[in-house]
Every structure is written in C-alpha cells, then in structure tokens.
Amino acid sequence: MASISDDGMALSGYLKKLKTMKKKFFVLYEETSHSAARLEYYDSEKKFLQRAEPKRVIYLKNCFNINRRLDTKHRFVIVLSSRDGGFGIVLENENDLRKWLDKLLVLQRNIANSNGTAHSPYDQVWQVVIQKKGISEKVGITGTYHCCLTSKSLTFVCIGPEKTPNGEDRVASIEILLTTIRRCGHASPQCIFYVELGRQSVLGSGDLWMETDNAAVATNMHNTILSAMSAKTESNTNLINVYQNRPDLSHEPMRKRSSSANEASKPINVNVIQNSQNSLEFRSCSSPHNYGFGRERCDSLPTRNGTLSESSNQTYFGSNHGLRSNTISGNRPHSTNKHSNSPTFTMPLRCSESEESSISVEESDDNGSYSHYRLNTRTSETAIPEENIDDFASAEFSKVTEPNESDENYIPMTPINPTDAIHEKEKIDMQRLEDASLHFDFPEHASEKLAKDYDLDSDNQCVRPIRAYSIGNKVEHLKFNKRLGHLNDTGQNPNRVRAYSVGSKSKIPRCDLQRVVLVEDNKHEFVANRSQSSITKEGSGYGTSGNRQKKSTSAPLLSLKNQINSDRMSDLMEIDFSQASNLEKQKFIKNNEIPKYIENVFPKTPRTDSSSLTLHATSQKDIFNGTKLNNTANTSEDGYLEMKPVGNAYTPSSNCLPIKVEKLKLSDYTAPLTTAAPVHDLNKISTYNISAEKWREQTTSEEKKSNSPLNEKPFSLKPTNVENISHDVHSTNNIDCEQVSVQSDKQNNLDDKIVENNNLDIGGHEEKKLVHSISSEDYTQIKDKSNDFTKFNEAGYKILQIKSDSSLISSKLYQKGIHKDNLERSHRLTESVNTIPDNATASSSVTKFNINAKAADSRSTDPSTPQNILQIKDLNFPSRSSSRISQPELHYASLDLPHCSGQNPAKYLKRGSRESPPVSACPEDGNTYAKIDFDQSDSSSSSSNIFNT
C-alpha cells in the first residue's frame, strides 16, 4: 500500500475488477486544489510508478451512488454507479471492504457538501436493461438504466446518451414511489424482473420488464424491493403527506396499503420457484442499510394472514416485527401458527377492511392473536366471528360465561342430542343478556337486523356455534317467510326447518291430491289431465279439503298453501309408498283415468248421467257406496306399489278387465275402409288376452244378456279380393287386424262402453286405438251436440265379452302354465282393422259366413263342437307365447249385432274418420250374440270358427 503523497493519494493497492476478476492496481485520490477526487487503476504497480496513463479514471463527483453489493457470488464487492455505468471492485476481506467503502463515502459526502447539494444515497443499485414492452416504449424508458432503491421510492437513472440510435428521447431519471407499485416478480431462467405499476404512479398503470446480468440479480432485486415495500417506518408512513404539502402526521399510524390488483392481472409467464427458508436467511443479512426498515406493508398481490415463519424467522434484531416473505415464491406453513405471548393491543396492527379498496389485505406483527377474526372498521364495538370461533382468544371480545368454557367451545362431531330444558333455558337467557349489549349503528340498516342473528329459535343451537350472517341476510330470509305466512311455524319449531328449492313449498304430491280430492269428494266426476300431470275436479277450482296424511320425511314439512299451481307440478313425479286407507278406492282412482285420445274426441263440457262412464264388472255407484270387489288374488301385497312394467305386471282379478269399454262403430260393408297400417296379409285379427279367472266372474252377466230374444236375419257375404286402399293413416301399429262391417238401422240405447288399453306397448307417436269409419258430418255433429248422444239411429256392434278357451283347458284357476302365460299377456289389447274394398253394389260381399242368431249359454261353449263352422284361410294371428302352450288356445268374443235394415248406412257410416262416435244403445232391446273362435295355435294356417248362437 502506498501512503498519501502530495498529489492527494489516499489509498492504493491490488484489487480485482468485478467484471473480469483480474487483479489491477487501484489508486484513490482526494480532492485537491488542482485535481478532483477520483479512482484510477493500472495494470500493475510498476506502470503506476512509471507514471503511465491509467487504464480508467472514475471521478467521484460523477458517481451518484457508492455502496456494497450483495447479489453476486463474491462476498466483498463495492460498486460505484455513475451515468457511464457501474464499476465493481472485489476485495479480499471485510476489513479491506470497510476501509475502502468508508473512504469512498467520505469523499462523496465532501463533494456534496462543497456543492451545496444534499446527498441521498441509495440502498441498492442494480444495472438493468429495460425492454420495449408494456409502458416502457410509450413513456420512453428503454435501454440500460440503473435501478436504485430507497426506503420510499424506486429510481431509474439513465446510462449512456439520452437519445437512442433512432433519435428517440430517453428519460434521464424518474422516481416511482413504492406505494404506487402493485406487485413485482422475476423469472429465473430468463433473468427477467418486472414491476407492475398502479394508476397513481408517475408513468401510469402498466408493467416494466427489465433484464439483469444473471438470475441471481433478478432474485435479489425481487426480494429486496419486496422487503422495502413491506417495511414500515415513520418516514415512509408520512411520505404522501410530505409530498402533497400536508402537515406531518408521524404520530398517527397510516392505513395499511391494500392491493388494487386482482388475480386477473397476474402475468402467467413468471415462474418463481425457490426455497422459502433460504430466501429468508438470505434476506436477513442483506444490507446494513436495511436496519432502518420497519414499515409494515402488504404487497400488491391478494394476500393472506401472516404466519409464524414470516414473522419471527425474518427479523434483523430478533424481535416479533419482521419483513414479509415473498408471496409468489415461498411456502406458507399454516400449521405452525401459534398464539402470541405479546400483550394485546388496543389498535390492531392488521390491515382492516376499508371502503376504498376492493381487496382487503391482512398483515400483523404479532403471531396471530387476531388470526381468526376480522375487525370491521365501521364499528369498534363488535367483531363478526368466522368459522374458527374456538380459536379466538382476546381480552376485548371474549366473554367468560361459565367455568367450563373449554367444554362449550368444543364442537362435537357426533349427532347432536337435545339437552334438557333447564340447560337450554339457561343458555337462552345467557344469550339474551349478551344480545342486550350489542348495538349496531348502520346508516342503511336498522339496529335490530344483526341483533336477530343470535336468535336460538331459528336453528337448533344445542352446542353448535352461532352462525355468522352477513348484513341483512337473515332478516331478508325472515321477511320472506313472513310474506309466505310461515313465520309462526318456524319460530315455534326448535328443530331445523327443511330447506326447499325454489317453488317447492307450494307443490302438493300427486298422491295426496288423489287421496284427498278424489276419494272424499265422491259425488263428482273426475278427468285426468295428462298434459299437466295433475288430477282436477270438474266444476271446481284447485283446492284440497281434509287433513293431509303426514309422509315420512327427514325434516318437518312446511304448511301447505290453499292454492295449488298446476304448472309447478308439471315436471314432478312422486311415488307414494305409504299404506292406503282404502285399497279399493285407490284402485278405482288408478283405473279411472281416461286416455288422452278419448278426451280429444269428446268436448270438455259437463256430461249428463246418461253419457257418464260405466264400469263393466262393477259400477261407480257400488264403489262409492263401499261395495267390495271380488278379489281372488292374494291381498297380502295391499299398499305395495308394483314397480314392474305395466304390460307385464300381475294385478288382482278385479282389475283384469278394462273398466271402460270403448265404443265401436260398424262401418258400411259396401264402402272401402282405411287400415291402421299397411296390410300385407289378407285377413288380420285383434284379440284380447285376458286371464281365465276373469271369465268365470262374467258368466252371470253374459247369461242374462243371452236370454234376450233375437230377431236377427241371417245373411251371407261373398268372398272378394282384399285391397289396401289407404296408406296415409298416421299409426305405427304392427298388429294384424280384421274388422267385420255390418249394416243396421236399429237404434241401440246401451250404455257407453269404452275400452281403455293401458297395457299396450306404444310403438309410434300416437296411441293404439280401435279404428272405425265415421262420416265427417257425424263428427261435426258430435262436436257441436256432444251432450245428446241418443239423437241418431246408428248401426254398430259392441264387443261385450271376449273369452279365451284357456279357461276350458283346466279347472284350476292358477295352473302353472296358464298363470305364466296370463301374467305375461294380461291387459294386452291389440287393435286394428282389415280393409274391405267397396264394389259399389250392396249385393257384393267381402267374407262368406253365416250367422244364425239364437240364444246360448256362454259357459257351455265348447271349442270342439264343429257345427256351423266356416274356415277362413290365409289368416295371420299374433302369438306372443305360443311356445309355452302346447295346445291351441281359442278366444271367444260376444258381439252385439243389431238388426239389419234396408236403410242406407252411408248416412251415418262413411269413410275418412278414425274417431269413435258416441253410440247410445238401450239394453232392453233385443241383441244378437255371436261367438268367434280366434285360433292362435298355428300362425301359418289359422282359422276363425264362427258359432251361431
């Protein structure tokens, strides 16, 4: 080392350049009368002694900052920053570092004092290259700059010329307050550091992207700037007031800075992955200038509560007041949270919720005394507890109610059992005393709104903590219940009220409607509206009378409304598994529905008693009077709802026959008929597959009708070719069919019998129905005059009974083979017609057969009797379970054949309509019965045996 000479040399020696790490001979000169303070270096000491030209001269007056640098891999580095760039010196040890750094700083201060300028050194200076990205190009900050950090601002100083090679101006120097920085981060692989500025900054809102020498510099910039943003000092607290010429308010704490950024403004290309513990240890010894840092400040990201690792492990003096860790990089061990032993503060150190900021940020110097509570800045009298109420321990807000307070704060996870009445009463009284001390004063809310939040009557509060509501939340819920008229029910019920979806409280189950409306009001007629899936009573509004049977539910049902909205039940299907009070009434209600296609034919006006629905097996009057139906099936399954498909379900014998028999119209045998589907075979037929035991019940009614005198004249029809005339009938039934057409002018006053086919599998868009021919004039007359069905003289036949010979095979009702077959084919109705062309003459006939009308008993019919049988060839009959039955099965149909007449049948029977007109027949008139044998044993060569009865 050379001593101070006459030319002002202060220090000299061999040091290393930071950039090349080569040893050079450095000489430091003080300011003299004929030279300025400067730093020179030579290649060697020999050249210095030879008075050679120095390799570089750095004047201290041009250096705006001289400090120690810690972001390099070398420990002892001094950097001199000037407008020409930065120059780094690497020393051997700490003593040399202190000696050279102190001498340089003394000389720099002397220069500032001589010039009359205040010297404000920077804590950290980094040399960066600002990229043309974000707002940098717009404001003119591009190229190489010094990034200088102080406790209150971040300054960018231009390096090099103030004009770019393109002639654009560059900003020489600009200072950005730390309070206007939203957030910062770095990308390690790309050596990129960025800063996001807010709207209150000098440059406006935007991002500044800068490139550093290496990734270590970018990491150090991020940690150091973030620590400065999170520090708390009195000077930085009152910085805004000083800049705006306001009085110094250092004795009053400044509101903690909350973030104005949200998650959407985060750059997604910034990946910061580093060890939290290493970064904390690295920052704890960053710079001696950091000793003055103390301002607590939340960073610009949406942040969270401070943890133990961010408070005690990040301190410089070992106190509880420390620096925040990097919120981007760093783990947050929440499990290490512990209550602080420090005394409670009257003024909370955490950033509270404010009206100015959209995102509230919470920071604290203590280790979580208020970690589970938020203090509302609008009032200082109470705090709203959140979920972790058992962790709250504060002398200001906690109230000691009983000695065993720890037992009350414990929340059991077992099902809550109701406590005794005395303990419950004590808790309610204690809670009312606490509620009396609560006072809320909001300009837009009444004081009693939040006072009702601690009402124990609304919920079952055995040992559970009180639920925290937002402002006005529960009050609006109570107002809604009051408008609905349920306030008294919920207030008197200590249990938890069942939660309903929107509009579900006004829904009444369909089973309750059937039970209440249809069974009790038994003197009215009912129409099942399938479009709305509800049952309504004709001539009256929607309403229920009587008591509802309470269903088994997990929560108490709320009271029902008197008015029922049918639209709300349009998308609801409920299944009632409860025991029915009267099984027979329930079965009648189930089978009393009218098909939709029958409702469309008749007008929806009130019907007279003459046109009302009648039953075949039993009458409606007998059911309402309490008459028991003959039920041969086992009744052990009463009340159980069969979940099998309707077509395959086995029902008791009382429900085997259809309750209503559809009116069938006899078309003109001289007019062509339209078919339900394109006919590929000559003769098609439809049958009823009905169990054998049902026919045993119907023998008495058939015997009575068979005794009536028959005056029918036999007639014959000649066989002709069969044509398929019309293919445009909208139906998709694949069932072979045959229709016999007979002309008649006899007026029949029989009761209407409607066949309801509930068990057919619908293969198309419209339901299967018996197809008949009716003129368009008759259809118009029916629509206009639907209440009078007895005005027309119509010819037709009615299928009174259909009997299978399965009842003749064996005397047992429940034989195994027959039971399986009847179980599969019960309630199946196949309907269709056979097309008969018109030959334009009344003498032409379709099928040749003889019908000799005479009275006979249906029970004595034997399929083996061959008298008066005409074979009809080329018939295809549907057979579903022909493999199960080894012997032929015959089906008999009792037909009501009215008297033939010479009147023109075209007056009433015409082509072109498929609806069944109303037929009124008198049971007192003489009827003709014929039994037709439909043989299903052989599908290839089937026959039809017609018996003259």
UniProtKB/Swiss-Prot annotation:
UniProt-recorded Gene Ontology molecular function terms: insulin receptor binding; insulin-like growth factor receptor binding; phosphatidylinositol 3-kinase binding
Database matches in PANTHER family: INSULIN RECEPTOR SUBSTRATE, INSULIN RECEPTOR SUBSTRATE 1
PH domain segment(s): 8-109
Entry's Gene Ontology cellular component terms: cytoplasm; cytosol; intracellular membrane-bounded organelle; nucleus; plasma membrane
Biased composition (Basic and acidic residues): 696-706
Pfam family, one: IRS
Compositionally biased spans, kind Low complexity: 937-949
Domain IRS-type PTB: start-end pairs: 122-236
Composition-biased stretches (Polar residues): 304-345
Short sequence motif YXXM motif 2: positions: 640-643
Name of the featured protein: Insulin receptor substrate 1
Keywords tagged on the record: Differentiation, Growth regulation, Oogenesis, Phosphoprotein, Repeat
Job description of the protein: Activates phosphatidylinositol 3-kinase when bound to the regulatory p85 subunit. May mediate the control of various cellular processes by insulin-like peptides. When phosphorylated by the insulin receptor binds specifically to various cellular proteins containing SH2 domains. Involved in control of cell proliferation, cell size, and body and organ growth throughout development. Also has a role in a signaling pathway controlling the physiological response required to endure periods of low nutrient conditions.
GO biological process: insulin receptor signaling pathway; insulin-like growth factor receptor signaling pathway; oogenesis; vitellogenesis
Residues the record lists as Phosphotyrosine modifications: 410, 892, 929
Placement of sequence motif YXXM motif 1: 410-413
Gene3D superfamilies: Pleckstrin-homology domain (PH domain)/Phosphotyrosine-binding domain (PTB)
